Amino acid sequence: LVAVCVSLLGAANIPPQPLNLKQFKNMIQCAGTRTWTSYIGYGCYCGYGGSGTPVDELDRCCYTHDHCYNKAANIPGCNPLIKTYSYTCTKPNITCNDTSDSCARFICDCDRTAAICFASAPYNINNIMISASTSCQ
């Protein structure tokens, strides 16, 4: 029993592997001035899922990012929601560093492009938490 407790204590000191979405959140904050939470529920595509026509330029950024992740998922063994990658942030510049892992590089490029797009697109407060049934046709 003591051996089990000691091994569990040792395992508790191992930091969790960051997931891709955490990296994407950090990239968003590197490229722009808004926090990633500003984009949850924005338009028809920012946040989980999406449908219809994007309502503005920022929503198109989310639409494009969603489709980029769909393309990444077509790479054998590539899961864009959990695959991590290497990048450098020198605010506001982002550089993807993976060269040998095509999945990691593809996802990093998806996230980098979206983060830069978010930073440059106008933010319309009226497009937060809109009704999908009426606005996302």
Curated annotation (Swiss-Prot):
<feature type="disulfide bond">
    <location>
        <begin position="46"/>
        <end position="62"/>
    </location>
</feature>
<feature type="binding site">
    <location>
        <position position="48"/>
    </location>
    <ligand>
        <name>alpha-D-mannopyranose</name>
    </ligand>
</feature>
<feature type="disulfide bond">
    <location>
        <begin position="61"/>
        <end position="117"/>
    </location>
</feature>
<keyword id="KW-0479">Metal-binding</keyword>
<comment type="function">
    <text>PLA2 catalyzes the calcium-dependent hydrolysis of the 2-acyl groups in 3-sn-phosphoglycerides.</text>
</comment>
<dbReference type="GO" id="GO:0016042">
    <property type="term" value="P:lipid catabolic process"/>
</dbReference>
<feature type="disulfide bond">
    <location>
        <begin position="78"/>
        <end position="103"/>
    </location>
</feature>
<dbReference type="GO" id="GO:0050482">
    <property type="term" value="P:arachidonate secretion"/>
</dbReference>
<feature type="disulfide bond">
    <location>
        <begin position="96"/>
        <end position="108"/>
    </location>
</feature>
<dbReference type="InterPro" id="IPR033112">
    <property type="entry name" value="PLipase_A2_Asp_AS"/>
</dbReference>
<keyword id="KW-0800">Toxin</keyword>
<feature type="binding site">
    <location>
        <position position="45"/>
    </location>
    <ligand>
        <name>Ca(2+)</name>
    </ligand>
</feature>
<keyword id="KW-0106">Calcium</keyword>
<dbReference type="GO" id="GO:0005576">
    <property type="term" value="C:extracellular region"/>
</dbReference>
<dbReference type="InterPro" id="IPR016090">
    <property type="entry name" value="PLipase_A2_dom"/>
</dbReference>
<feature type="binding site">
    <location>
        <position position="49"/>
    </location>
    <ligand>
        <name>Ca(2+)</name>
    </ligand>
</feature>
<comment type="subunit">
    <text>Homodimer; non-covalently linked.</text>
</comment>
<comment type="similarity">
    <text>Belongs to the phospholipase A2 family. Group I subfamily. D49 sub-subfamily.</text>
</comment>
<keyword id="KW-0378">Hydrolase</keyword>
<protein>
    <recommendedName>
        <fullName>Basic phospholipase A2 2</fullName>
        <ecNumber>3.1.1.4</ecNumber>
    </recommendedName>
</protein>
<feature type="disulfide bond">
    <location>
        <begin position="30"/>
        <end position="89"/>
    </location>
</feature>
<keyword id="KW-0964">Secreted</keyword>
<feature type="binding site">
    <location>
        <position position="66"/>
    </location>
    <ligand>
        <name>alpha-D-mannopyranose</name>
    </ligand>
</feature>
<keyword id="KW-0732">Signal</keyword>
<feature type="active site">
    <location>
        <position position="65"/>
    </location>
</feature>
<feature type="binding site">
    <location>
        <position position="66"/>
    </location>
    <ligand>
        <name>Ca(2+)</name>
    </ligand>
</feature>
<dbReference type="Pfam" id="PF00068">
    <property type="entry name" value="Phospholip_A2_1"/>
</dbReference>
<feature type="active site">
    <location>
        <position position="111"/>
    </location>
</feature>
<feature type="disulfide bond">
    <location>
        <begin position="44"/>
        <end position="136"/>
    </location>
</feature>
<dbReference type="InterPro" id="IPR001211">
    <property type="entry name" value="PLipase_A2"/>
</dbReference>
<dbReference type="GO" id="GO:0006644">
    <property type="term" value="P:phospholipid metabolic process"/>
</dbReference>
<keyword id="KW-1015">Disulfide bond</keyword>
<dbReference type="GO" id="GO:0005509">
    <property type="term" value="F:calcium ion binding"/>
</dbReference>
<dbReference type="GO" id="GO:0090729">
    <property type="term" value="F:toxin activity"/>
</dbReference>
<feature type="propeptide">
    <location>
        <begin position="12"/>
        <end position="19"/>
    </location>
</feature>
<dbReference type="InterPro" id="IPR036444">
    <property type="entry name" value="PLipase_A2_dom_sf"/>
</dbReference>
<comment type="function">
    <text>Snake venom phospholipase A2 (PLA2) that shows anticoagulant and neurotoxic activities.</text>
</comment>
<dbReference type="InterPro" id="IPR033113">
    <property type="entry name" value="PLipase_A2_His_AS"/>
</dbReference>
<dbReference type="GO" id="GO:0005543">
    <property type="term" value="F:phospholipid binding"/>
</dbReference>
<feature type="signal peptide">
    <location>
        <begin position="1"/>
        <end position="11"/>
    </location>
</feature>
<feature type="binding site">
    <location>
        <position position="47"/>
    </location>
    <ligand>
        <name>Ca(2+)</name>
    </ligand>
</feature>
<dbReference type="GO" id="GO:0047498">
    <property type="term" value="F:calcium-dependent phospholipase A2 activity"/>
</dbReference>
